[in-house]
Regions:
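Conserved, structured C-terminal
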Residues: 1-33, 38-43, 106-111, 116-441
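Active-site-flanking structural segment that lines cofactor/substrate pockets
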Residues: 34-50, 74, 78-79
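Short acidic (Asp/Glu) and glycine-rich catalytic loops that position anionic groups and cofactors
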Residues: 48-53, 190-191
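A short catalytic or substrate-binding loop motif that flags glycine-/basic-rich loops and adjacent residues
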Residues: 53, 95-98, 347-348
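N-terminal non-catalytic cap/leader segment that marks the start of a structured domain
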Residues: 54-55, 139
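Internal amphipathic helical hairpin motif
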Residues: 65-102, 150-182
Length: 441
């Protein structure tokens, strides 16, 4: 199979189809707001696969003898015990132990690391200090994400390569017949099940995207847009800045001098409470990633918190009658705050936090309610007092903006993640690939 170049119009990394009518400006790069209807797409990673372009943008490469040293002094992870050809989720903190940024990095070698996400702020600032023998470069790169039981099959069909031996977190270069570019595939994703990324040079983006859409048609591939990108993070149990909370970088005056936007605070939590819009690693159940065998920014605060943790991450499953009542109220003279679909507050919504009560006492903060057309439920991530409530307890979430009309939403405390709680899909980390048809045949 030789893939054909896209001959139609294009915008940045993407082809423009006749139904490509809604676009989203994601950090100055355009992506689809909604490719296929969200209620179809949100079933795709359980039934077939999707393709998503939303994190395409700049790829930053840090290279040189001090590349690992620079990263090590900024992140809570151990960057020295890390095999080349694999990726790792690095977490940057401020001195108070709040998450400044969290980013997936690829390790090419002991002196070269790459990322295609995040804001790149502190690596650039520290590199410019002259204290490190490093070089930082950037280029425009497409990143197309796939997830679902046929994601690997479609990728193999386009690359004409057997990738069944690619393990979780590994990446490797691949060729795409008909396209004279440099590409790589990585086994990673946030839906909680089988998932991959394809990356390559910006110029090939529209061609590669269309090739996968054509190849995946027989498997029912769907185009996921930014409107429903947050669904797999929420149900997959992967907390995400700009979705479930906001970066603590918004409290850094130097960052705000170059930031493209300010933090937008909505929800029933007082907007003056900026702390409720940020998280520590402990508050999103990421403390297991921290390694205290090196000095890093925020270490003292994180160590102190881990000795006496006060909050945890859980899932809240909302009472369906209460959600229906919110929508029914829109047809009266006294409506509650509207809930969009599938994300009740459209992206970017990390600054949205709602008060959570148990027996009338505030016990936590709930992020934006999010709907799944697969499970037919609406859930949210909740950072809750560690003894605030137990799994199975009922709590109240105050839906509505601070000072405005609010609706009490009943919710049941569920574990994080929801897909692991439901246990109806295989985990990407140990997915049985013998059940996946080989697309290179």
């Amino acid at each position: 199979m030789e893939n054909k170049r896209w001959e139609g119009p294009r915008r940045g990394f993407l082809p423009v189809y006749s139904d490509s009518t809604h676009w989203f400006d994601c950090a100055s790069f355009l992506c689809y707001w909604e490719g296929d209807p969200f209620y179809e797409t949100d079933k795709s990673w359980f039934e077939s696969t999707y393709i998503h372009s939303g994190i395409s943008g700049y790829e930053q490469t840090i290279s040189g003898p001090d590349a690992a040293k620079l990263l090590s002094e900024l992140v809570m992870n151990d960057v020295y015990k890390w095999r080349s050809g694999t990726c790792k989720h690095l977490v940057f903190l401020n001195e108070e132990g709040l998450i400044d940024d969290h980013v997936l990095y690829m390790k090419d070698s002991d002196d070269q690391y790459r990322t295609t996400a995040g804001v790149f702020f502190y690596p650039q600032v520290n590199a410019a200090s002259g204290k490190y023998d490093v070089n930082i470069t950037q280029k425009k790169t497409f990143v197309f994400q796939f997830s679902g039981p046929r994601s690997l099959t479609v990728i193999e069909k386009v690359t004409q390569t057997d990738l069944h031996d690619l393990k979780f977190l590994e990446f490797r270069p691949v060729q795409i017949p008909g396209f004279d570019g440099s590409f790589e595939v990585c086994r990673i994703g946030m839906s909680g099940t089988l998932a991959y990324e394809i990356r390559g040079e910006e110029a090939w983006g529209a061609d590669v995207y269309n090739a996968y859409l054509v190849a995946g048609a027989e498997y029912g591939i769907k185009r996921l847009g930014w409107r429903d990108y947050t669904v797999n993070h929420t149900f997959g149990g992967f907390p995400q800045q700009t979705v479930h909370w906001e970066m603590a970088l918004f409290e850094d005056p130097e960052f705000m001098k170059v930031a493209r936007t300010a933090m937008h605070c909505t929800g029933s939590v007082d907007p003056a409470n900026r702390r409720a819009r940020h998280r520590t690693p402990v508050e999103v159940n990421w403390e297991w990633m921290a390694k205290f065998n090196h000095d890093f920014k925020g270490r003292a605060a994180l160590e102190k918190e881990m000795q006496n943790p006060t909050r945890k991450l859980v899932t809240l499953e909302f009472n369906q009658e209460d959600i229906i009542d919110v929508y029914a109220s829109q047809f009266t003279d006294h409506p509650y705050k509207f809930m969009d679909m599938p994300c009740a507050e459209p992206q970017q919504c990390g600054g949205h936090q709602d008060v959570v009560l148990k027996d009338g006492v505030e016990i936590g903060w709930s992020s934006v309610p999010t709907y799944s057309s697969h499970y037919h439920v609406m859930i949210s991530h909740c950072t809750m007092d560690i003894h605030g409530a137990e799994i199975g307890d009922e709590v109240i979430v105050k839906w509505g903006d601070f000072g405005g009309v609010q609706k009490d939403l009943r919710a049941i405390v569920r574990p994080s993640s929801y897909v692991r709680y439901k246990n109806d899909v295989q985990d990407n980390r140990n997915y049985d690939l013998s059940t996946v048809p080989n697309g290179n045949r």
